[in-house]
């Protein structure tokens, strides 16, 4: 127990009402957030002589201050707890690393509805289908729907400004409602209804209606129409045959858990309208000494309740672990959803099979993750030995990319003890230097990255400079001039130069810009981690450079036209669907864009044609 914190005096002031407590260390950092039905009883349990676990002992030893927020109900306490966890990210709480909202397929409520991927709040008028496990699953489904039910997927700005059909119409993936006379209102509405039924899991109704239409077309001797509908029927059947189908109407999230070597994997299986939409594995950050029950309970609460990114709730949640707060969780979710949400921990029949599947997937994903982490750990340990460091907890690497000196981009990638930390990758647009001057680019990015206050935990142990002696000299010069509150001598600056043939395994490493470097054997684990982070940095820089180059390519022609500033350029590209669409547009079409006069439209048309 902390000698500074007076637990007895504090507990005398605590109420027995429900609420949330926040524990702080000597530095004023929130180290733990918890909730309680009875705050006094719960907080008293931390200051007994026989604590429940080593984790609790370590936590209590660091407490210097506790804040308490009283709530009206346990449900309020549960919601507030998870909002605080998301806000403070306390190191003694189990933390859900990936808190992105799940994507949905959106069917708009326009006169001619469109299909699109959607994340976040559902403000737009229309229908939402999902959730899907990731953006790839949505894009794959949209591509499939476009082949079977050719309704539009273009933005409204593009749709409203077309006078002739686009390429999607030419290849049969859109009915072309943007141009009058290409498709009847009835036919388009019918295809939209098929999409609605299909995404709602009512495949049989889609097939029944299509078969009836095909037979009628045959009777009317409209054989081309009958053949088109026949192809549509076959496409729907091919898709439905591949899908794993559960009981019709099942609307479930199935959560399986695996726990080993201090690491947890939570696998979530999404079933909507009786179909498995997909699944996803999570690896929450687990403080040492945490029990599996706490991992499951905290994960489920964070997964469904945290902040504005609240998940779409299914009718039922299946778990393979008993929760002490199961009733409270179900009541809280039901209150949020405005309907009854069931939390089931002992399912039978098909539901038990789903749970077994989720548990198996969790175990498999955890084995893979542990294997990868073991490899990364071995490589970082080997590199630390080569560099004579006690350990490497964080490593950063920089690379520069440009084309003939133009659109220069610098990348910074970050590795921690578990490997790539992609959420902390950064790109820097480099400006104000002589084109092609990589040294100046490196100088600029290092000053921008390190010439400011940095949290203790984010100071790298190793900074890898791709480019050899010259770039390393720039890095040394920058660090010599830094005037910062953190220890600028802590990071080890390491230069890496590719061999004469630029082949992997022939790299030379430099501690200093002067003198000879040294090489590592091609099979060295230390070399492998250097190659890994350098390749990540190179790919990240190239990706950023390509995006920047593409952006410039799309706007450079317009930038030369007098009277077309940034806002008008953006409006033109948006309404015409890109530079190619603008090149193909007539003067009359260009003049329809907001803010573009007839005279300016003629000038734009002439400039693009010549």
From Swiss-Prot:
GO terms for cellular component: cytoplasm; excinuclease repair complex. Keywords: Cytoplasm, DNA damage, DNA excision, DNA repair, Excision nuclease, SOS response. Residues 16-94 form the GIY-YIG domain. Transmembrane segments: none annotated. GO terms for molecular function: DNA binding; excinuclease ABC activity. SUPFAM superfamilies: C-terminal UvrC-binding domain of UvrB, GIY-YIG endonuclease, RuvA domain 2-like. SMART domains: GIYc, HhH1. PROSITE patterns: GIY_YIG, UVR, UVRC. InterPro entries: GIY-YIG_endonuc (IPR000305), GIY-YIG_endonuc_sf (IPR035901), GIY-YIG_UvrC_Cho (IPR047296), Hlx-hairpin-Hlx_DNA-bd_motif (IPR003583), RuvA_2-like (IPR010994), UVR_dom (IPR001943), UVR_dom_sf (IPR036876), UvrABC_protein_C (IPR050066). It comes from the Bacteria. Its main location: cytoplasm. It is found in: Cytoplasm. GO terms for biological process: nucleotide-excision repair; SOS response. Residues 204-239 form the UVR domain. The UvrABC repair system catalyzes the recognition and processing of DNA lesions. UvrC both incises the 5' and 3' sides of the lesion. The N-terminal half is responsible for the 3' incision and the C-terminal half is responsible for the 5' incision. Interacts with UvrB in an incision complex. Belongs to the UvrC family. This is UvrABC system protein C. The gene is uvrC.
């Amino acid at each position: 127990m902390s000698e500074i914190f007076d637990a007895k005096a504090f507990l005398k002031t605590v109420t027995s009402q429900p609420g949330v407590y926040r524990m702080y260390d000597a530095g004023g950092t929130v180290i733990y957030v918890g909730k309680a039905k009875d705050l006094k009883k719960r907080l008293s349990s931390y200051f007994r002589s026989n604590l429940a676990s080593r984790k609790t002992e370590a936590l209590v030893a660091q407490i210097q201050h506790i804040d308490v927020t009283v709530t009206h109900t346990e449900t309020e306490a549960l919601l507030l707890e998870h909002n605080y966890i998301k806000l403070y990210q306390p190191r003694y709480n189990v933390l859900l690393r990936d808190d992105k909202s799940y994507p949905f397929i959106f069917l708009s409520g326009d006169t001619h509805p469109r299909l699109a991927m959607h994340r976040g709040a559902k403000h737009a008028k229309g229908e939402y289908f999902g959730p899907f496990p990731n953006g790839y699953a949505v894009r794959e489904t949209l591509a499939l729907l476009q082949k079977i039910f050719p309704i539009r997927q273009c933005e409204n700005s593009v749709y409203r400004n077309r006078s002739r059909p686009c390429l999607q119409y030419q290849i049969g993936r859109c009915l072309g409602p943007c141009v009058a006379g290409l498709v009847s209102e009835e036919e388009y509405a019918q295809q939209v209804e098929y999409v609605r039924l299909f995404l709602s899991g009512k495949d049989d109704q889609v097939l029944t209606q299509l078969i009836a239409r095909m037979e009628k077309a045959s009777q009317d001797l409209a054989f081309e129409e009958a053949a088109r509908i026949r192809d549509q029927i076959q496409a729907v059947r091919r898709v439905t045959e591949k899908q794993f189908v559960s009981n019709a109407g099942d609307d479930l999230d199935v959560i399986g858990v695996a726990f080993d070597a201090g690491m947890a994997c939570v696998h979530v299986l999404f079933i909507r309208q009786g179909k498995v939409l997909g699944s996803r594995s999570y690896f929450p950050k687990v403080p040492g000494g945490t029990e599996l029950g706490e991992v499951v309970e905290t994960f489920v609460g964070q997964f469904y309740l945290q902040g504005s990114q609240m998940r779409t709730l299914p009718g039922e949640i299946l778990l393979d672990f008993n929760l002490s707060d199961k009733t409270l969780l179900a009541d809280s979710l039901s209150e949020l959803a405005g309907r009854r949400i069931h939390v089931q921990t002992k399912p039978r029949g098909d539901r038990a099979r789903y749970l077994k599947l989720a548990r198996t997937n969790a175990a498999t994903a955890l084995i893979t993750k542990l294997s990868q982490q073991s490899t990364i750990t071995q490589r970082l340990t080997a590199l630390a030995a080569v560099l004579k460091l006690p350990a490497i907890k964080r490593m950063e690497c920089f690379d520069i990319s440009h084309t003939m000196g133009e659109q220069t981009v610098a990348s910074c990638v970050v590795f921690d003890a578990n490997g790539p930390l992609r959420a902390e990758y950064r790109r820097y647009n480099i400006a104000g230097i002589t084109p092609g001057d990589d040294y100046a680019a490196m100088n600029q990015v290092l000053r921008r990255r390190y010439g400011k206050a940095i949290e203790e935990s984010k100071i790298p142990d190793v900074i890898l400079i791709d480019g050899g002696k010259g770039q390393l000299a720039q890095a040394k010069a920058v660090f010599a001039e830094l005037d910062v509150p953190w220890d600028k001598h802590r990071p080890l600056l390491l230069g890496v130069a590719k061999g004469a043939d630029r082949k992997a395994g022939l790299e030379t490493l430099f501690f200093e810009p002067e003198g000879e470097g040294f090489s590592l054997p091609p099979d060295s684990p230390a070399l492998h981690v250097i190659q890994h982070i350098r390749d990540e940095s190179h790919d990240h820089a190239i990706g950023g450079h390509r995006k920047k180059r593409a952006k410039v390519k799309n706007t450079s022609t317009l930038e030369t036209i007098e009277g077309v500033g940034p806002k008008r350029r953006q409006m033109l590209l948006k309404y015409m669907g890109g530079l190619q669409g603008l090149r193909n547009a007539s003067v009359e079409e260009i003049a329809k864009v907001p803010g573009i006069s007839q005279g300016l439209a003629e000038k734009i048309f002439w400039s693009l044609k010549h």
